[in-house]
Every structure is written in structure tokens, then in C-alpha cells.
Design a protein with these regions (language model features):
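Active-site cofactor/cluster-binding pocket
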Residues: 45-105
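Short alpha-helices
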Residues: 90-163
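A general structural signal for short secondary-structure boundary/capping elements
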Residues: 71, 111-116, 135, 186-189, ...
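Hydrophobic helix-and-loop "lid/oligomerization" segment in the mid-to-C-terminal part
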Residues: 1-38, 54-56, 60-63, 146-227
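Short beta-turn/strand-loop junction motif enriched in small, turn-promoting residues
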Residues: 9, 71-72, 128
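Solvent-exposed alpha-helices and their adjacent loops that cap or buttress functional pockets
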Residues: 56-59, 79-82, 99-100, 132-137, ...
Length: 227
């Protein structure tokens, strides 16, 4: 979701608008991505704000763009959805029973590999003046890599076209891989889950992922499931 938010941030800045990304409690998976923006003189200190700050900034002209979910309860600040009149939803997950009802634009594309892919497509045709910085292209590219398991699953023609655009915009594979690199504890836990996996009925792998000492065990468990 962070990569898609970064893309929307650049779109808003291209239009000369003040833009903020609402992030309450950054997980270990996105902290390396955020690190390049924090204390960076090219970006305002208010680029990332929490829910309380967001609610203080809302006015009649506020536009809320929700990325990578269409469920109100999954957003970083559900209250914003009821405080603003203009809401845009960009997501690649199928709709369920719980959806954001009052969006003026809801672009939900389940066939896209990721919301980052969708945002990359939008940015290509957004404005001739739009120029992604390298760090921004890296972040969006990283989002595609995560959702496609390094372009192995759910990657289609549009995925690679979006990736090519990001590479032309300055995304670098070496930098992206460094940002996504696991710490040693997460790596060991994932390896242990794979090592102890048992095969059921010849097609189902069942494993227990250790959680001791891990800040985000659910993330590590999901990574192990991709192995």
C-alpha cells in the first residue's frame, strides 16, 4: 500500500497540492521504505502523519485517496471517510460485503497484480509534467515485487509494462532488494517453517511458523507461504 500511496503523493505534488500520507504504526515491512523519506530535505516533515493529525487537517476541499483496500475498517483512519465529501478508492482486491460506500470514484481492478501496478499505469498518463524521483519509483516497484512474489505469481503483461515504466523512471533493482531484505531472525523463522512443513494429500503443505522474537510474525508467515 505504501508504494501506491507514494505514487498518489507524487501525482498530488505535480498538481501543486499539499499531500499527506496517513500511517499510524509502520510495520517492519514498510519502515525500510519510509526511511528514505524521513529527514530527507526533498520531502516535507509532514509527508507522513498519523490519524489524529489527519483529522485536524480535514476541510471542505480535502480529497481522500484510499489505496490497496476497499474496506473502511482496513484503512488507517476510517473517520476520514465520514469527514470528507470527495473520496477515491484504488484497489486490486475483490469487493466483499464491507465496502466504502460514498466514493466519488472507485477503481477496483481484481485482475491487476497490485495497486502499485494500477497507480503506475495512472501515472504514465497523468501529466506530461509528472516526474517520479528515483526513490519514489523504487517504492512503487517494490510494491509490485511484493505482491507478485518477485514477478512469479499474478504477473501479467500490464505488470511488466508498469515495471518497465518504473525502470525508465529510475527504479533500481539493487536498491529495491536492499530495502526488502529480511533481518536474520525473520529469515531463520521462515526457513524453519519451510523445513518443518508436512505435505498433506500430496498437494497441501502445512507448517508452523515460529513467532518468538519477531515483530511481525504474520508477515513472516505469509512470506513462508510463498516459498
Amino acid at each position: 500500500a505504501l508504494g501506491a500511496a507514494i505514487g498518489i503523493y507524487r501525482a498530488g505534488k505535480t498538481l501543486g497540492k499539499p499531500v499527506h500520507i496517513v500511517v499510524n504504526d509502520p510495520s517492519t515491512s514498510i519502515r525500510p521504505l519510509m526511511a528514505g523519506y524521513i529527514n530527507n530535505p526533498d520531502y516535507e516533515p509532514s509527508m507522513f502523519i498519523d490519524r489524529n493529525q489527519a483529522m485536524e487537517l480535514v476541510d471542505d476541499n480535502t480529497v481522500v485517496v484510499v489505496v490497496d483496500t476497499n474496506k473502511p475498517s482496513y484503512t488507517e483512519c476510517e473517520e476520514l471517510l465520514y469527514m470528507t465529501k470527495t473520496i477515491v478508492v484504488l484497489d486490486h482486491h475483490r469487493r466483499g460485503n464491507e465496502v466504502i460506500q460514498n466514493a466519488v470514484l472507485s477503481y477496483v481492478e481484481p485482475y491487476a497484480s497490485s495497486t502499485c501496478e494500477m497507480v503506475a499505469e495512472i501515472l504514465q498518463y497523468f501529466s506530461d509534467d509528472l516526474r517520479l524521483r528515483n526513490i519514489e519509483a523504487d517504492c512503487i516497484y517494490a510494491g509490485i515485487m511484493i505482491d507478485t512474489n518477485n514477478f512469479i505469481t499474478r504477473a501479467g503483461v500490464r505488470t511488466f509494462e508498469a515495471a518497465a515504466f518504473l525502470r525508465r523512471s529510475g527504479a533500481d533493482m539493487t536498491r529495491v532488494r536492499k530495502m526488502l531484505r529480511d533481518n536474520i531472525d525473520s529469515y531463520k523463522a521462515r526457513a524453519e517453517a519451510v523445513r518443518t512443513a508436512e505435505i498433506y494429500r500430496g498437494c497441501f503443505a502445512i507448517a508452523k511458523c515460529p513467532s518468538e522474537g519477531l515483530e511481525s510474525p504474520t508477515v513472516v508467515g505469509a512470506q513462508a507461504a510463498n516459498e
